[in-house]
Amino acid sequence: MPRVLIGPYLLRNQPGRFRQILTDAGFELIDPVGDFSLTSSQIRPHLPDIDAMLAGGERMTRDLFAIAPRLRAIARTGVGYDLIDVAAASAHKVAVTITPGTNQDSVAEQTMALLFALARRIVSNDRVIHSGGWERALVAPIRGKTLGLIGMGRIGRAVALRALAFRMRVVAFDTYIHAEFDERHGIERLPLDELLVTSDVVSLHLPLTDATRGMVNREFLAKMRPGSYLVNTSRGGLIVETDLRDALVSGHLTAAGLDVLCHEPPEPGNPLLGLPNVVLSPHIAGTDTQSMRDMAELAATTIVELHQNRWPADCVVNSELRNDWRW
């Protein structure tokens, strides 16, 4: 009987249709005991005996693939796969899949929630009242302000639609053009530097790659409009956190809303902890009850399809394996 390891904390030992999808296909499910994100030492004992992994925030490095001779598929819940050494996966003939189209609405809602938390001072007002105060300061409106989206994939476009509903002007930067969407919704494409100067709010919607790692650095932040806001619901590694701290402490940026950090959970010395103008959430943007269910079911389905030697082309990251991959 093939065995699949269940990685995400929110799915381990939890009911769900994804379990039925896998058990109906003849899989035995393994639910490890471990931290919110399983560590390498918690995954390692299971690797020699599993055929697939339904993954969340677990890191899969080259040395782990080397001790997983039966492993044929890693099905990632979500669309980011920067924690998986895809080159090593390909070298060991392990298909890596993602779940496109399952969580963009959840991420977009969290993006807007962070934007409003910053602009309307929701968190700081809450803290003041709970500590016995009652301060009523004016805030700037969102309507009429310019939102700059860096990245216009499914998530960026979902954010754009919500911002437009609040009568914001939306500008965007991406190397991929969705001309029909842009024209239909009045979205203007700008060069990156112009977007930074123009936008009242900059929101990041990019994968973490060698090209994007640390792109939000001192120079990037200096180009942003004075008094603007930064929102990040993609990957913490996009931002140089010490540089962001400096921009926030100096007042060049008014505030930042972050669902992601470079190290999660944050280490005690994280430079952003304790800043009154930073609103944080624990990397939950993509995981509401609906999106978690959809991601789990699609991930389970891709494992089953691969086991049956069907190729879920829209979900496989390392498509170069297709011609000679076998379960």
For the regions a protein language model found, what residue spans apply to each?
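An N-terminal-biased, well-structured beta-alpha scaffold segment characteristic
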Residues: M1-T97, N217
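Glycine-rich, N-terminal phosphate-binding loop of Rossmann-like dinucleotide-binding domains
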Residues: P8, A55-G57, G78, L204-L206, ...
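Short beta->alpha connector loops at strand-helix junctions that form conserved
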Residues: V33, T77-G78, V94-D105, D174, ...
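Short, Asp-centered acidic motifs that coordinate Mg2+ and/or phosphate
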Residues: D51-A52, A73, V201, Y229, ...
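Rossmann-like adenosine-cofactor binding region
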Residues: R62-F65, T175-P271
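Phosphate-binding beta-alpha-beta segment of Rossmann-like dinucleotide-binding domains, i.e.
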Residues: H92-V94, P100-T146, A158-L161, R310-V317
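Rossmann-like dinucleotide-binding domain for NAD(H)/NADP(H)
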Residues: V96, R218, G227-W327
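Glycine-rich Rossmann-fold phosphate-binding loop(s) that bind the pyrophosphate
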Residues: M152-G153
